[in-house]
A protein has these predicted regions:
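AlphaC helix of the eukaryotic protein kinase fold
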Residues: 62-97
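Protein kinase glycine-rich loop
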Residues: 17-23, 28
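Activation-segment/catalytic-loop signature of the eukaryotic protein kinase fold
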Residues: 109
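A short, low-complexity linker immediately N-terminal to eukaryotic Hanks-type protein kinase catalytic domains
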Residues: 1-16
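Conserved short submotifs of the Hanks-type protein kinase catalytic core
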Residues: 113-126
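Flexible N-lobe loop architecture of eukaryotic-like protein kinase catalytic domains
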Residues: 21, 90, 99-102, 124
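Short acidic/glycine-enriched loop/turn segments that link adjacent beta-strands
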Residues: 23-25, 112-115
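Glycine-rich ATP phosphate-binding loop
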Residues: 30, 38-75
Length: 126
């Protein structure tokens, strides 16, 4: 049901390293963000540890083994799945505007594999 370790998202921008936890609505992964830091004399490629939350409404969906796409069991389930996916996307966008030392920073929200993902700051020990 989880994405495999090493799986890439957003055309290689993010890579899953391992599962941190999962519940009824989401699977949370630790991952890396491939980015670059630019200075006045050059650019350095770097990997930033991040947290990636995948919307996976486990009672209503499953993952295709070959494509890793998230599929819904029924049309009734599709209505519920889509409704909560849109709420998750909206919540991520709102959270991205909140900046506080005790609230995790959101990098972006995106759709891929038939579901939604939130890329956010990784805080060790949480």
């Amino acid at each position: 049901m989880n994405l495999p370790n090493g799986h890439v998202l957003q055309n290689g921008k993010y890579r899953i390293t391992h599962v941190i936890g999962q519940g009824g609505f989401c699977i949370t992964y630790k991952g890396v963000w491939y980015t670059e830091v630019k200075g006045s004399l050059g650019t350095v490629q770097t990997e930033v540890p991040i947290c990636i939350k995948e919307y996976f409404f486990k009672d209503y969906c499953y993952r295709e083994a070959e494509s890793f796409a998230v599929k819904v069991h029924s049309e009734t389930g599709r209505v519920l799945f889509d409704k909560f996916k849109e709420k998750l996307i909206k919540e991520a966008k709102i959270l991205s505007e909140v900046h506080h030392p005790h609230i995790v920073n959101v990098l972006e929200v995106f759709e891929e594999n038939g579901t939604a993902y939130i890329a956010m700051e990784y805080i060790p020990g949480c």
